[in-house]
């Protein structure tokens, strides 16, 4: 497991672990204006997360009032909870649109006061697979998104306060624009990022085709298929919820689409902890028709 995620492994509640991940994970790429984890956590951030892990009822109630099946909205809800509860942060606005007549120019993810200072924070949690050695060839598993598109969009969003149509709350004229990026990047064996903006310390995994040999770190590890809303933080599971490598391969033999899998080993308390993760994709991935639609957008 990445050293930066070891603290997350101490947390047993999945939503609390996901929240800690969103606040502390290394960014997949450098935006140039990344907010520090220390500033988001504040002086008592980790004790507050431990207390929330001991009794996650308030966070669970917050999420229950905001049900979603979309990972991005789930992540936004988690961050919204933290920004509404952390004593050093004031949540002023979330998802505030900027409209120029009938045209929506963009949307502020969060407008915050952190230790009294106004901040525009753009947040994103992304998962991309490296197709080949081309610098921009990091694409989403569904081939509807790509890193280069998000990279350019984020750069634009971070300047949103400068747009003539932007209407900011009182006291935000001198705001600071920052980003909080999280997510995972997945690479074929023996490949590495090629774009200088990619963070070499990012959370990384592998990807391979279903019929290939799957990378395995330990001969006695167990495996777990991760639903989309469990993609954020490193997985934990009881042994009964896991499978052997052979059983997992058999289960996915006829499965459709990419599947995200976690490889796990038991810790000293008998909890199976993620040690690696990767996408297993069909032999036909990437689908030519979807890739053919995506690639021209990358070249634009």
Regions found by a protein language model. Give the residues of each.
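Intrinsically disordered, low-complexity Ser/Thr/Pro/Gly-rich regulatory segments
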Residues: 1-300
């Amino acid at each position: 497991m990445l050293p930066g995620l070891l603290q997350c492994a101490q947390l047993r509640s999945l939503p609390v672990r996901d929240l800690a991940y969103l606040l502390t994970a290394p960014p997949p790429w450098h935006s140039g204006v990344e907010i520090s984890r220390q500033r988001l956590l504040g002086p008592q951030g980790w004790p507050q997360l431990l207390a929330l892990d001991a009794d996650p009822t308030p966070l669970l109630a917050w999420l229950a009032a905001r049900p979603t099946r979309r990972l991005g909205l789930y992540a936004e809800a988690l961050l919204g909870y933290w920004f509404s509860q952390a004593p050093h942060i004031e949540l002023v606005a979330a998802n505030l649109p900027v409209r120029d007549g009938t045209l929506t120019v963009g949307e502020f993810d969060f407008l915050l006061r952190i230790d009294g200072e106004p901040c525009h924070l753009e947040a994103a949690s992304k998962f991309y697979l490296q197709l080949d050695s081309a610098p921009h060839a990091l694409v989403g598993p569904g081939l509807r998104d790509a890193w280069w598109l998000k990279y350019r969009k984020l750069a634009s969003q971070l300047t949103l306060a400068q747009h003539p149509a932007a209407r900011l709350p009182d006291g935000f004229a001198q705001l600071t624009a920052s980003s909080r990026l999280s997510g995972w990047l997945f690479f074929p064996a023996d490949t590495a990022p090629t774009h200088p903006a990619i963070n070499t310390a990012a959370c990384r995994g592998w990807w391979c085709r279903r019929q290939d040999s799957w990378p395995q770190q330990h001969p006695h590890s167990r495996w777990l298929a991760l639903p989309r809303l469990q993609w954020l933080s490193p997985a934990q599971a009881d042994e009964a919820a896991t499978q052997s490598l052979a059983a997992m391969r058999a289960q996915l033999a006829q499965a459709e689409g990419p599947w995200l899998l976690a490889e796990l080993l038991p810790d000293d308390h008998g909890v199976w902890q993620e040690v690696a993760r990767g996408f297993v994709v069909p032999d036909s991935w990437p689908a030519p028709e979807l890739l053919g639609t995506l690639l021209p957008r990358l070249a634009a």
